[in-house]
Amino acid sequence: MGHEVAVSAIQLATAFSAIANGGYLVKPYIVEQIVQSDNKIEKHNNISYKRQIADENIMREIKKMLRQVITSGTGVEAEISGWEIAGKTGTAQKYINGK
């Protein structure tokens, strides 16, 4: 997502999920449920907040671009029949003569 920009994996996943969700940001969670020793299930997947951070039409256009990476770009090998896959091209910072 840019040179010299440090983000965690969960931050990156959250950003891309906002694109997939039409511009809505949802707090990420990792644990869906906990099963107690007595088989009682404790759910942890409640959406704690959801807010719109970008226009849905803009997100639709970004999704189209990310989709093209898979359908006709460098990510064609990632295509999975029956699934709508989107991807981002690789970003590299090239050094020439040590710079």
List each language-model region with its residue ranges.
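Conserved interaction-surface patches within small, structured recognition/assembly domains
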Residues: M1-G2
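Conserved phosphate/anionic-ligand binding catalytic regions in large, soluble enzymes, centered on
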Residues: V5
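Active-site-adjacent helix/loop patches that line small-molecule binding or acyl-intermediate pockets
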Residues: I10
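Conserved active-site-proximal loop/helix segments of enzymes involved in bacterial cell-wall
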Residues: A13-I80
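Short, Gly/Ser/Thr-enriched beta-strand-loop segments that form substrate-interacting elements
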Residues: W83-K99
